[in-house]
């Protein structure tokens, strides 16, 4: 995993670039915003476990204590089909009924600005998903975690989104039927339709470039609104630079 939780087998640390702010009234560190937007997918058999992990449920409840982590927000389920009373049921059904070798879920892992308040981070994520997940009616769950870097001690807020490509079209189906193959002649007889991420794009690579650029623009708009500049000291001089990110800096 990209974001390291002390005490969890999740190798690889991450810290934001630290710049010192030189002000007579304050000597605190400030951070340039950082860009991280990874896209992963997992086959059936992993969805329920991952939902429990990001939601810190059952066997993962102890992570909060061992890693000194804050779970800032959990959205258990949006755009869920009618058979779902608890999102656990949806992800369990994906593991049980998805076809062999089918993707049970896609995950977006997104770094969030630690100079934002938890409420601002939540709004930042919600408004992005309202544009890029909700219109397709992808059933999804997400959580915002904040864990301190083992290297710098700074906050590392980030979001884990997981969603199914089986779009909720509002037709009543059982859990088993929902994951069957789509029937274009009579949708009520088959499963929900899979809307592939690359639909409307030349190919999957084109989609990845598009969605990462969309996050860059979305985050930069919010940075311009809430914390547009960063000031630091170089050779005794205060230098103020624009606080913005670039998807081009992201190591794929």
Task: Label every PLM stretch briefly.
Residues 2-252:
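N-terminal nicking endonuclease/strand-transfer module with a His-rich metal-binding environment
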